[in-house]
Amino acid sequence: MCIPKSNHKKLVDDCYPPPKALITSAPEYRPNSNELGRLTYYAQNKPAKLTKVGNLLESKAQADARAAKASGPAADKGKAALMITLAITKNLLTECKNSLNYFIKPSQSIIAAALDAAQPTSARPRDLEISARAASAFYALASFLDPASSVVDEGFQRLLRSFALLAVERPLGADATLGEDAEQRNRTRLIGLGALAGAVASDAIYSSNFKQLLSLLTPALVENAKANRVTLDWLRSESNKATEGEPTYAEFNIAKKPLAIRRTRSISAHVAGEKGPSSEDVISAAIGTLRGLLRHADAAQVQSIVQNVIAWLDNKSALSIPVPKDGRQLVSHWDDPEWCCWLAESLCSWTSLQYRFVVLDTLVDHLAENGEGKATNKHLSLIQMSRTILTGQLSLIGLSTSDTLSNLCALAVRRVYKDTRDSLLPPLVDCISGLGTHVYYADQINDIVEEISGRIAALQMPESISDAASVKASNNLGAVHRGQQQDLSSHLHRQRLANAGPEQRDESIRVLLFCLQGVLKATHQSSGEIHEAVDVKSNGAEKGKAAAASTDSKIGLAHAGTRNRVAPASILPTASLLASPNHAVRLAYAQTLITLFRDEFDREQLERESAVFAAAPIGEKVSDAIGVVHAIGAAAHVMCLSKSLSPPAQVLGNLRESPLELLPQIDRINADPGRPGSLSSGGSGTPAAESTAALPVDYVAVAQALEHAVTALPCSAALALTPMLVALDKDAGSRLTVHGATVNTGLENQRRLSSRMVAARVLAKLGETFDTDSVSRAAQGVLSQIPSLGIEPGPSPVGGLTLPSEVVPFSAVGSINQLGESSSSSSPSLNGALVINSLASSSKLQSATQLDAATLKRWLERDWNVGIAVDEAFAGSSPYAHSSLGTGSQQASRRPSYTPINGLSAGGNAFVNGSNASSASVNKNSRISMQAPSTGVNDLREALGTAASLSSKQANGTTQDGSLSTDRRASRRESRRGPVVTSANGSNGTSAVAILDSLKVGVDEDASRLGRDTSWSAIPAKGITNGTAPISPPYTS
């Protein structure tokens, strides 16, 4: 009896050979071609029938898979039928790709049944023919799967997991005691990698659930790219080939094309008798597939890939990697830093240009999150991987250098606070230095210097301020799913900071200084060319150009790789480090200054530039740089003359905005000879006590730094340092001179000679720079009488972060100890008036600064002390008119930089000579009220170039005994405001000041009605009646 069949069943059955001929269909196992064509045509014209066709094929595959697991002729027959079913499935997936939704479920079940039938058993190894045919069908399924219209469900993930496990399988040989069968392993893994290549080339892998899929794909690919079977040089060569799209094994080369024109690949098993694939073929296939995966990934997918690589390195990947079966122990992949660096660089090079920075960001974020605890090989490898990317030849467009620097610097500080000799600190410094290798925007290096300077300044501030700033910086991790880790890191960091002492703080500062030096060194070793920023104004013919082009011209981006030089003001908060109580910090900062002055800061030209190529006017250049020179000069003065650089805790607690506020207070404390705990003036001192003050190497280092400052910024140095040097020579004789029997070996004598050596060396450099022979001869005469200290620290260490140098006290410098104190030790060794007159008369200085001799002399002979210098540093004071009239944003920084303890103006010498008791008598609230910045009518009068009698009294201030300051001091403070352009103020009683006087603006009327204050009547007001003559402006036409 003939039982009729449905049309789809008849078409499917006709595709198979007769039952007796199934076994003879080996080894091709092909379906009947004509009948397969009819089935395909039927499915294309009736897409809904694909469901029935698929269900029928699925039932056949399940039955044939069960038969194939057995043994004997039945197994061979079942295998043949299963192979033909897989071939029919692949053909339908390829030809009916527009109706794939009807066939996805059955096809996944067919492939899964085939993989289950091919599993190895105790009686036989894995069936590679079934595995290869199943991989080909999966390749077709993945290639034509459209996530927009199809659902990538758990069935697809299970298949992907199965092929990923196939790609990392370790099959045993016929004799299990011999371990793995290398040839069988390579064949098996190559089949699995072929299926994974199909998944990488599909759209399914880049769907919304890409994280689950990538967690299976990535470990399988990286596992096959290890260097245990090939050399690292071969891996580098293969990586370069893959980057160019030409790997050695190109069968699975990923070329993602539009869905309509995609083609499937036939993955075949190894043919008996042929030479099996080599380990190089497997590694090349894995590298090519991984490169294709990264090349088509976006930022989120690249981040997920790198996170899965890190999880695989931790042996915590979502894919279970089998352990070696040949007796070898499983070792951590972090123990091979060279291979890890190759992997990081390769991942970065294979990623699209616009997403390469994600690789580095992910590595740095993971390092910052997991940087606690004992130093391990993982920490070291992560640091070296990050450094390899930063210093490589790859461009990282889009990289946030600020976030990267913040994370790495915060980690370095945390490691220092855990252990000041932590083994990760040198590689961390090298990694941070790598940020200077590539320049991605014009002000990148300047921003890096400002970031590091800000961190250093925060570390010098009181704990309540520095802790908050440091924790805030350390929390800038900028990624997702890290909230709990951030809270834990913040808590640990705050707890560590609370338990830390000055040693950890000083070492943190020293490490950051080495980071700064490393960034500058890497910047100058790179090929980037330095260009000054020029504001290019477009003319009328260029108005139609794109807005982006005009924006580039404004920030000075003329060509790729160009950058602006570091602005001197960026290191202003760090100038007080020259007077740090830690000798290693002082030396590191002096070396940093030498590097900046020698290589980085824009040099001031001594010759007048032509109008065509002239940059900013000299007045603007000086105003930009002189604030830093003021601050460095004040710190150098404090360092040279201080008996102890360790401030009391109460003084440190008074700091509120800037570490520079500390300099005047240290100077005042050391100027008081009766201060308890001061160093003995007659004894040689112990090494512990001597280390709290300047050492011989400090004097030499600061002399070198100031000499480089003269070379790089000659005009600013001459205007800012000359009064300091004259004062240093004078104060060395008055404050470091002790008359006693043991004076020949006293610290005071040694420091006095060293301080005068510093002043003489810098003045000799100034004399040489501005061709003033009298200054050079006078300075050389002083130097000829001072023996050499025999110590030359050099600009900076060559090999990055090193241990602090040993303390070499003055007692170890024999030459200077042989010089006793002469009868003229208390007198200045240099004629200050001669120095000032000679420099003011220098035609070269006048030409360079574009100031006349009278203006220069007035400026150079102004009052100088540390307090004044710090105020001038904040205000950027210079003898140019515009420098005394700051903008609104600058006014707040011009307030006194330290707390006036006597309730009076802190600009004069009265404050410097104050007592310690007065500091303790002022509470915090009063200090805050005295430091509140304000702008009133008197400030307006001073800005307009004159002052009424009342404002003159307030500007001159009083001494502690209530007497008025002399008219000379008033005139010199007036000169610090710069030359006054009188034409701007009007004349003939119509000036703004005259109008203010006529309206009695700013005059206390109630006080005027009471008459003249009798307490002031007996004091001659010379400073009021004999006012100083106005200074002629330097620019007159």
From Swiss-Prot:
Belongs to the EFR3 family. One of its GO terms (biological process) is protein localization to plasma membrane. It comes from Mycosarcoma maydis (Corn smut fungus). The gene is EFR3. InterPro entries: EFR3, EFR3_HEAT-like_rpt. Pfam families: EFR3. This is Protein EFR3. Residues 948-965 have a biased composition (Polar residues). Residues 966-977 have a biased composition (Basic and acidic residues). Residues 881-901, 947-988, 1006-1037 are annotated as: Disordered. It comes from the Eukaryota.
